[in-house]
A protein has these predicted regions:
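Short aromatic/hydrophobic "clamp" motif used to bind/position activated sugar donors
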Residues: 104
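A recurrent flexible, glycine/aromatic-enriched loop bordering the glycosyltransferase active site
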Residues: 146-147, 159-161, 167-188, 205, ...
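Glycine-rich, basic loop-to-helix element that forms the pyrophosphate-binding segment
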Residues: 81-99, 109-111, 120
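A short, conserved alpha-helix in the catalytic core of glycosyltransferases
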Residues: 179-230
Length: 345
């Protein structure tokens, strides 16, 4: 195991151990130098109406005393300490591998959960067996009147976007199917990771949750949004600013990976003109704000290293799912344009 140290909550009797083993949910929180966020995140979990969960922090070799702080102030939290930074994908994969519960709830360290968050996610997950993931209603931490994310969508332009970002928090009150869950606050059905696969560690960070949701959809599983499971989210809590060289380059590279892995050749050819247009528009945008070279470098790296990715094996029985996904890519492009127009008004 890649964990250097694992702190387990101690149980004093067999009965307590049985109760511990019967939890429905493991909350996995990846952390890298996030000590400043931990009080909000962990104290909000103490106030959950459902106690049917255990909590595991995956610490990616933090240098800010996060581990000692958790041990001192939140002794009920299990900790797995990595020897080096595995990124989001590698870190949460370690966490998922340590879980034995039916459901895994991935939660960013820069979140503060509403009291019914866990309870509502469990209800939604138990409503249908074909649900792979359930996404929370994420609200901007610094502006409680605005949405941060209501599930993620993907377009034929090769752009992923946060559904509802910047819109009034009173919107998006209804459950809905989404392209993928935002893994910053989402519950997954653990047994399906064996079929769908884990997070792609080549991604390191960014678009890894979209790639996972895409793979689940290819196999006919659903990703849904639960408006009653709510969290406040700071955003860019680990990487820093909204745009930086690291984020721009990795996002560009990973967008190439997502398309190469998940689209069979005919679908890639069908979407090639839209993808080319999407990459060009993004390049123009990043040139304008000073990250044009980083974006191009990311695309080049993605193209040159794409064959390191494990391409989804095409199965004839999934043709209907591919067609449904293609329709969603077109529909989501229109949705993106509409939401962009709303934000500009």
């Amino acid at each position: 195991m890649r964990a250097e140290n694992i702190q387990h909550q101690k149980n004093n009797c067999g009965k307590a151990w049985v109760a511990y083993m019967e939890k429905k949910v493991t909350i996995v929180i990846p952390n890298y130098n996030g000590k400043r966020f931990l009080d909000d995140c962990l104290s909000s979990l103490e106030r959950q109406t459902s106690k049917d969960f255990e909590t595991l922090v995956i610490d990616n070799a933090s240098q800010d005393d996060s581990v000692s702080y958790i041990r001192e102030h939140y002794p009920w939290v299990k900790i797995a300490v990595m020897r080096h930074n595995l990124g989001f994908s590698g870190g949460v994969n370690v966490g998922i591998g340590m879980c034995t519960t039916p459901y895994v709830l991935l939660l960013n360290n820069d979140t503060r959960s509403f009291p019914k968050m866990v309870e509502e996610l469990i209800k939604t997950m138990e409503s249908a067996d074909d649900i792979f993931s359930v996404s929370c209603k994420m609200i901007q931490f610094h502006d409680h009147e605005k949405m941060d994310d209501a599930g993620d969508l993907y377009t034929c332009l090769g752009w992923a976007f946060q559904r509802g970002v910047g819109q009034p928090v009173g919107d998006y009150r209804e459950p809905a199917e989404v392209f993928s869950a935002c893994a910053g606050a989402a519950m997954y059905r653990r047994e399906l990771f064996a079929k769908v696969g884990l997070f792609d560690e080549l991604h390191f960070a960014y678009l890894e949750d979209l790639d996972l949701g895409y793979r689940a959809k290819i196999q006919g599983y659903r990703n849904v949004y639960c408006p009653t499971a709510k969290v406040y989210h700071v955003g860019s809590g680990t990487s820093g600013s909204k745009y930086n060289s690291f984020k721009v380059k990795l996002s560009a590279r990973n967008s190439v990976y997502v398309n190469y892995k998940n689209m069979p050749l005919p679908q890639l050819i069908l979407n090639a003109p839209a993808l080319a247009a999407g990459y060009f528009v993004k390049w123009c945008f990043f040139m304008k704000i000073g990250f044009g070279k980083d974006y191009v470098d990311g695309l080049k790296e993605g193209i040159s290293t794409r064959k390191k990715c494990k391409k989804v094996f095409f199965r004839g029985r999934d043709i209907r799912n591919y067609w449904q996904i293609q329709k969603e890519l077109w529909e989501n492009t229109i949705t993106y344009i509409i939401e962009l127009a709303k934000r500009k008004l």
